[in-house]
């Protein structure tokens, strides 16, 4: 029996102020609704261990502050991340419109910069009745960007686990592809090189 592989992944969650990033993260990691609203200054980090595709994943999830004045500081946390959740509030059209800026900012800062960087979009607060962002508009935007979309509620724990685990699965695939490419590159031999002989 093979021992289960272990992989550490760094995920980030970004979006405008007040969309519920911290509540989503607490619901996923602790199965509790984070009722007390406090602005995240900079970033906070929570970890969760899950088993996915016979691999033990240690997810280090960075909850970033959504205030404009912290954006330049927060963007330094994007470096080295393996995947990103773009969150918005379905009752706040401006938070949805800001997703382009958040997405572009993440893609500009990740290292290494590449197009296959996994992202998922979460429309939070579907438990509220005053929805202002239609599903059709969001689905169109996500289809154009080739990103999965989840309608979620941190308060009622709707689709939260599924969304995080789809991102984790995509990040794992990317990680495995990167690790495989490094292995292939490191074992390539140049043909025709003479071997040195001793005595």
Curated annotation (Swiss-Prot):
Its main location: other. This is Ras-related protein Rab-7b. PANTHER family: RAB FAMILY (PTHR47981), RAS-RELATED PROTEIN RAB-7B (PTHR47981:SF22). The gene is Rab7b. CDD domains: Rab (cd00154). SMART domains: RAB, RAN, RAS, RHO. One of its GO terms (cellular component) is lysosome. It comes from Mus musculus (Mouse). It is a lipid-anchor. Gene3D superfamilies: P-loop containing nucleotide triphosphate hydrolases. A motif (Switch 2) lies at residues 67-82. GTP binds at residues 15-22, 34-40, 63-67, 124-127, 154-155. Controls vesicular trafficking from endosomes to the trans-Golgi network (TGN). Acts as a negative regulator of TLR9 signaling and can suppress TLR9-triggered TNFA, IL6, and IFNB production in macrophages by promoting TLR9 lysosomal degradation. Also negatively regulates TLR4 signaling in macrophages by promoting lysosomal degradation of TLR4. Promotes megakaryocytic differentiation by increasing NF-kappa-B-dependent IL6 production and subsequently enhancing the association of STAT3 with GATA1. Not involved in the regulation of the EGF- and EGFR degradation pathway.
């Amino acid at each position: 029996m093979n021992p289960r592989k272990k992989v550490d992944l760094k995920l980030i969650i970004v979006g405008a102020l007040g969309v519920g990033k911290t509540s989503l993260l607490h619901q996923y990691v602790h199965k509790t609704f984070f009722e007390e609203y406090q602005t995240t200054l900079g970033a906070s980090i929570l970890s969760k261990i899950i088993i996915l595709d016979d691999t033990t994943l240690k997810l280090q999830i960075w909850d970033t502050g959504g205030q404009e004045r912290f954006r330049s500081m927060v963007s330094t946390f994007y470096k080295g991340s393996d995947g990103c959740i773009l969150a918005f509030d379905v009752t706040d059209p401006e938070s949805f419109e800001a997703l382009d800026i958040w997405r572009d900012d993440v893609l500009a800062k990740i290292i290494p910069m590449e197009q296959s960087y996994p992202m998922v979009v979460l429309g939070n607060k579907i438990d509220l009745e005053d929805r202002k962002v239609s599903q059709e508009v969001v689905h169109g935007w996500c289809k154009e960007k080739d990103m999965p979309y989840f309608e979620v509620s941190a308060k009622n724990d709707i689709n939260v686990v599924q969304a995080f685990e789809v991102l984790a699965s995509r990040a794992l695939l990317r990680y495995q592809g990167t690790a495989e490419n490094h292995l292939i590159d490191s074992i390539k031999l140049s043909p025709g090189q003479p071997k040195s002989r001793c005595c």
